[in-house]
């Protein structure tokens, strides 16, 4: 019987280190969650990441050699935090002979919403500091998550206005569709 294979995922793009471990289920093309931890690590990702990964693996009873995939959050986020995660993931994947996958931290939020049953339009916005944000819009339907734009940095006020304008436009389109599909009723 083949040894169980696992995927290790982590993200240090923000002030919280997120680490997850999943069992790979090739038959179902799925990853089954095994364990996860989030740790507040303000400017301490470099000293906390590997310690916390080792603890999670130990608690789950998983050996490093069972890791077939390393998945890393590639931001957007803290310049140093993203580089710590990327370098750690690349080194671990290379040392273990495991696959390496980079994932947008914003896409993870959208996929989590989708997996929780959210459908329709979704905006994910992350703080970029200095009154700027990383906004990305998505369409979530039964087929999955569809990213509608590339990563970018804009002033928070600009992103907020864009979202208000989009919501107003969607409301206007919906109103127009309703009006054109129903008879006009007048009271004289």
What does each of the following model-derived ranges do?
Residues 56-60, 95, 113:
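Stable alpha-helical structural segments in soluble proteins, enriched in small hydrophobic residues
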Residues 25-32, 38, 44, 99-177:
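Surface "functional belts" at beta-alpha junctions
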Residues 48-52, 87, 91, 108:
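Short amphipathic alpha-helical face segments that pack within enzyme cores
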Residues 174, 178-188:
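Single conserved hydrophobic/aromatic residue that forms the stacking wall/gate
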Residues 71-102:
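DPxDG-like acidic metal-binding loop motif
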Residues 14, 130, 182:
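Short, glycine/acidic-enriched loop or turn micro-motifs at the edges of active sites
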Residues 2-74:
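N-terminal beta-alpha supersecondary unit
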Residues 10-13, 52-53, 74-75, 82, ...:
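Fold-independent oxyanion-binding glycine-rich loops
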């Amino acid at each position: 019987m083949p040894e169980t294979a696992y995927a290790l995922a982590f993200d240090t793009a923000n002030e919280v280190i997120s680490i997850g471990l999943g069992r790979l289920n090739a038959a179902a093309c799925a990853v089954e969650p095994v364990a996860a931890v989030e740790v507040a690590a303000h400017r301490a990702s470099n000293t906390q990441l590997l310690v916390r990964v080792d603890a999670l693996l130990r608690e789950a009873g998983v050996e490093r050699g069972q890791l077939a995939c390393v998945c890393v959050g590639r931001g957007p986020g803290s310049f140093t935090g993203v580089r710590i995660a990327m370098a750690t993931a690349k080194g671990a994947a290379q040392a273990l002979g495991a696959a390496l996958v980079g994932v947008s931290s914003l896409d993870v939020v959208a996929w989590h919403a989708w997996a929780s049953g959210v459908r329709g339009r979704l905006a994910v916005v992350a703080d970029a500091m200095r009154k700027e944000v990383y906004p990305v819009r998505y369409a979530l339907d039964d087929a999955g998550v569809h990213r509608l734009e590339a990563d970018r940095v804009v002033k928070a006020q600009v992103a907020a206005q864009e979202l208000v304008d989009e919501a107003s436009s969607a409301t206007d389109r919906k109103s127009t569709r309703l009006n054109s599909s129903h008879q006009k009723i007048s009271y004289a």
